[in-house]
């Protein structure tokens, strides 16, 4: 091997072949710094072991749990596609069907099925009314400001969970003495910053250019993001000094007890599929099956290869979950024009009124859309609006809108039990919302009595969408007092408010395509918990993930949550 010091000196020697002591010291310092920098880049961490540990576990251990969040994966799609997915098939069913997998076929998402509340519910095990994240954007009536959760750092979700004293699976793992890692997750409370591998701005920028050049689409490429997620899982993140599985194994001799990986690419890809798919009118199921085969199955193969290479695979359990589904968009509703038309009749925030000046605040929507109505006699937004004087004029304006008449299926109206209209003749206030049928009211004279008679029990909602979706039950657990909207518009399936007409599919609704997903737990370590393959058709909820994951990873849940451990019920 050549001597780098000698090579350097050849270029720097003086005429008498002498090097001054001062220069020699400087040169050695530079070389030493370069050497340290190279080692630092290769390892991606700052903790170096004195000697490399042997590969694989040396003594029997509890299985290592991998929770793989497949964002927006529809109900049953994964299990129905296994024949074309060799890596998923190998992890779920095993060689010669050896693994006694547990398949939860019908898992209900907390509604409406938007990303931030769905993921927060998924990893906390409690409903939005408890964890405080009811949507991606909402109006805080008490603070009189709009809250938005569009952030790479996810710090705002952490702040909300701390304020509501809500713990995550990572909190429970830490208190149970279990190590954990989170990769590209939207919920990070409880995870040490050195154990959270996030998707960098660089990765998203690369994904944008990749999709622009290969498909002419100015939307980040979901496949590039997911490949970057796997790379981060295995190799870590050099800019934030976080170790991936390779670094953890090298420095500690093991991998985390719990690893949560969020593959967000399918959600983006289903929103904006390849142009040839749009041209050929592919269904959402066809798009997602293609993505599973071409993108996610190879990524899972990389994880399995790493685990097998290091003799770790036989001691793992994989829990594949989804946060919500997707629905093909039938028609885009022009949100701006909709608000502009309402602004001709009402004082709408931003058109041009401030929150203090406005009578209503309209939030961006998808399959559903919420509105906050001000009590014009009240001092602030926390005062319940009067039914006839404040709420009825807004609904009258909505009923006359041409888009609403075409796309609206039903309305919900907030009740405020015990806070208003105590002497008002009409329906009692004992629930969070009333069900309001706009079609029957539209045909009436729209007098005060007609309006009050159109307010029906919230349970009526279940008759419209199907009792199995538990829509009324879910809406009772979505909002807390300070963020409860006064009016919720629920569109027909496939009708979406969206400013982007290029979007092919979306979520955020209360119907089956959005609200049903599936879970499956398997892998070589699943034999500790199951003795034969099981398909559970009984309905469970996404918030049941936390107690079931705790069961699989030996984590103690030390405070009340809403989710239930469905694995105990299998015994």
How does the language model describe each region?
Residues 48-102, 561:
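Active-site-proximal N-terminal segment of extracellular/periplasmic enzymes that hydrolyze or transfer
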Residues 126-282, 498:
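His/Asp/Glu-rich, glycine-adjacent segments
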Residues 315, 322-378:
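Acidic/histidine-rich catalytic neighborhood
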Residues 43-44:
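C-terminal motif of bacterial Sec signal peptides marking the signal peptidase cleavage site
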Residues 166, 358-548:
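Active-site neighborhoods of enzymes that stabilize oxyanions during catalysis
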Residues 62-76, 91-92, 122, 173, ...:
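Beta-strand elements within well-structured catalytic alpha/beta cores of enzymes
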Residues 76-131, 181-182, 531:
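Short, structured active-site-proximal loop/turn typified by the sulfatase FGly-forming signature C/S-X-P-X-R
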Residues 87, 295-339, 412-414, 423-428, ...:
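Metal-dependent active-site segment of extracytoplasmic phospho-/sulfohydrolases and closely related
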